[in-house]
């Protein structure tokens, strides 16, 4: 569910991969319309995937169909231009649709983008939106590792259960696990469980990370022994990535 620290953990995963596998091609995709991953990673974004989609839509609406087809045919090259090359990884933002209402057209485009780019990178880390929308629309049809994030609340675990049930029916994944983030009372950890899903890590509330957020600092400025970095390292180890 929203507010459990999903984007913060995703940025920490990117950092862990960058530091553990120098020289590997790593792509971070911000697929959440809340667009927070760029800030967490310290990336400045000028253009998004939705900018390209909007150009196709607008040229079509103006009746300029030949130009719209040309833009569509050039999409692969335009997408690479949209990527931000950072120190050790590339970053791609899907963007927030300008029009109010359904986000499904962007999700459909995102599905094609992920399929197109996956083979060009050794690791692709996707920060999806909260809830089951992108799973239900099969935005990520095939993933190696599906990481669910919750806090200690029953509501958070219920959302994770819904995501797993949807994933079991609609997509293909090799490994699944759950991170319990923002743990306030460790004595309650045994109550946070989901059938068929291993808990990868219990991560206590992290005051250092909270201070980082207040000052607008990126995940790369966190000390290695901060709760979030220690927890994410443990989670990746339990997933078999390390």
What are these regions (language model features)?
Residues 70-86, 90-126:
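Cytosolic-facing regulatory segments adjacent to core modules
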């Amino acid at each position: 569910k929203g507010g459990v620290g999903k984007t913060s953990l995703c940025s920490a995963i990117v950092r862990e991969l960058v530091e553990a596998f120098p020289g590997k091609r790593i792509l971070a995709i911000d697929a959440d319309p809340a667009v927070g991953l760029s800030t967490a990673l310290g990336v400045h974004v000028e253009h998004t995937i939705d900018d390209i989609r909007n150009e196709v839509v607008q040229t079509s609406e103006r009746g300029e169909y030949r130009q719209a087809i040309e833009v569509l045919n050039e999409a692969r090259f335009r997408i690479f231009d949209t990527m931000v090359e950072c120190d050790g990884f590339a970053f791609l933002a899907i963007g927030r649709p300008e029009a109010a209402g359904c986000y499904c057209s962007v999700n459909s485009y995102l599905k094609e983008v992920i399929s197109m780019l996956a083979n060009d990178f050794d690791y692709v880390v996707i920060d999806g939106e909260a809830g089951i929308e992108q799973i239900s629309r099969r935005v990520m049809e095939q993933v190696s590792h599906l990481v669910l994030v919750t806090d200690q609340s029953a509501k958070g675990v219920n959302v994770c259960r819904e995501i797993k049930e949807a994933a079991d029916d609609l997509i293909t994944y090799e490994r699944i696990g759950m991170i319990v983030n923002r743990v306030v009372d460790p004595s309650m950890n045994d109550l946070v469980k989901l059938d068929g899903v291993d808990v990868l890590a219990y991560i206590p509330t992290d005051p250092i990370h909270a201070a980082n957020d207040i000052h607008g600092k990126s995940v790369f400025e966190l000390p290695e022994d901060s709760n979030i970095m220690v927890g994410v390292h443990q989670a990746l180890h339990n997933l078999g990535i390390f």
